[in-house]
Curated annotation (Swiss-Prot):
Protein name per UniProt: Large ribosomal subunit protein bL36
Natural source organism: Sorangium cellulosum (strain So ce56) (Polyangium cellulosum (strain So ce56))
InterPro entries, A to Z: Ribosomal_bL36, Ribosomal_bL36_sp
Keyword Lyase carried by entry: no
Highest taxon of source: Bacteria
Length: 38
């Protein structure tokens, strides 16, 4: 899980999901998991 100020899709399989106001990226590739933290 990468925590970044700005999250972006890395590949075509990446999806942007909002959970409890937190923007996350979920993907088949575990290295592409991201969470937005300011």
């Amino acid at each position: 899980m990468k925590v970044r100020p700005s999250v972006k899709k890395i590949c075509d399989k990446c999806k942007v999901v909002r959970r409890r106001g937190v923007v996350r990226i979920i993907c088949e590739n575990p290295r592409h998991k991201q969470r937005q933290g300011n």
